[in-house]
Amino acid sequence: MKKVAVLGSGQVGEVLANGFLKHGYAVMRASREPEKLAGWKSGAKGEAQTGTFADAAKWGEVIVLAVKGSAAEAALEQAGVANVAGKTVIDTTNPIADAPPQNGVIVYFTNANESLMERLQKKAPQAKLVKAFNSVGSGFMVDPKFELPPSMFICGNDAGAKAEATEILAKFGWETVDMGAVEAARPIEALCQLWCIPGFLRNDWAHAFKYMKP
């Protein structure tokens, strides 16, 4: 199993870090203030450690970017562009603005012709970014329980990295739908807005997307 670095001290980072541990991966979880993760480390089941963004990015063979969207570019800089070069970087982020939803629709700081993932890929051109885990709530990211296996839409420029992400997603209970290159992150990131609407309007957060064909 490869070593997985999870960058982020929030709920998404915790859920995914625990998911990787559950499925047998060694995990280093990272924060700007690693001491805040001491409680997580002491209770983690598996080969778990903590460190700074740079520590984790150097150590990890697969990187998971699990910070809020407004902090994503800074987190990538702190991780070190050289440290993520040539590695699969699973980008879970969405460009959510620091503003309240408008009639149930989350506000983004990007527009329809640009994605946050594209900004990140430009900042770290040698990293093999794959967009994933951004279109569902954290409670369903690992081993989701639905009537059918849900679909995770992914994209990225590197076929090998997407294959690696697909393998991880399969272990976590997901069907993967490859939507092509990094530009596809524009509509994939918008899926977060769509996913959240039933939650804001009807308090319905227990759902996921399914790609179906005849």
Regions found by a protein language model. Give the residues of each.
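Short beta-strand and adjoining strand-loop segment in the mid-core
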Residues: 103-113, 144-160
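Short, glycine-/small-residue-rich phosphate/pyrophosphate-handling segment
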Residues: 111-135, 143, 164
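Nucleotide donor/acceptor-binding cores
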Residues: 2, 87, 150
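General beta-strand structural signal in soluble alpha/beta enzymes
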Residues: 50, 90, 128-134, 177-179
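Rossmann-like NAD(P)-binding element
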Residues: 41, 45-90, 94-102
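Active-site-lining helix/loop region of Rossmann-like oxidoreductase modules
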Residues: 150-214
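NAD(P)+-binding Rossmann beta1-loop-alpha1 motif at the extreme N-terminus of oxidoreductases
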Residues: 1-49
